[in-house]
């Protein structure tokens, strides 16, 4: 796992081979952050939420680029521990890893975020419900951006908050505002 830009640029973290997580590919992540860098000034007091954080690849990228606060929610204990280890290695207090279910977090949090990224397992039965839940719970700040990573089998173009979809190989990102 590689950090693409920011204060931890080019840092690498070895993800254990036995991980069940499917990390966002470097190719997809780099292209996504190229798009985001034109939309978000990460050094402007941004608070972010990384749901279904997996390896924490997006979380460390957000911290590296200057986010003030990143909450990283991951259910799997091994993945959660890896995220904690990465954040300890870079000695940051900008990321709060939480071991828990993404849906329960959405339901219980009172925080609002400038940026939300969700990368649930592509085969998750209720993946299609995530955008509705984010907006029903009011988790985005005004002018906030929510991105959902998903496989080709999902199409969110009819969602009232959908603005665009980007595809990089087998990785799809749907953008919502």
Predicted regions and their residues:
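Class I S-adenosyl-L-methionine-dependent methyltransferase catalytic core
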Residues: 1-177
């Amino acid at each position: 796992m590689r950090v693409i830009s920011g204060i931890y640029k080019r840092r690498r973290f070895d993800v254990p081979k036995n991980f069940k997580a499917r990390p966002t590919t470097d190719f997809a992540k780099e292209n996504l952050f190229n798009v985001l860098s034109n939309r978000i000034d990460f050094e402007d007091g941004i608070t972010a939420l990384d749901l279904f954080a997996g390896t924490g690849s997006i979380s460390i990228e957000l911290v590296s680029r200057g986010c003030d606060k990143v909450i990283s929610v991951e259910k799997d204990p091994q993945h959660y521990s890896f995220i904690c280890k990465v954040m300890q290695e870079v000695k940051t207090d900008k990321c709060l890893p939480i071991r828990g279910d993404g849906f329960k977090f959405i339901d219980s949090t009172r925080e609002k975020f400038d940026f939300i990224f969700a990368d649930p397992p592509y085969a998750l039965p209720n993946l299609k419900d995530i955008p509705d839940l984010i907006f029903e719970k009011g988790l985005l700040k005004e002018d906030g951006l929510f991105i959902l990573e998903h496989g080709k089998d999902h199409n969110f173009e009819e969602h009232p908050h959908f603005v665009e979809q980007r595809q990089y190989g087998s990785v799809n990102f749907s953008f919502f505002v």
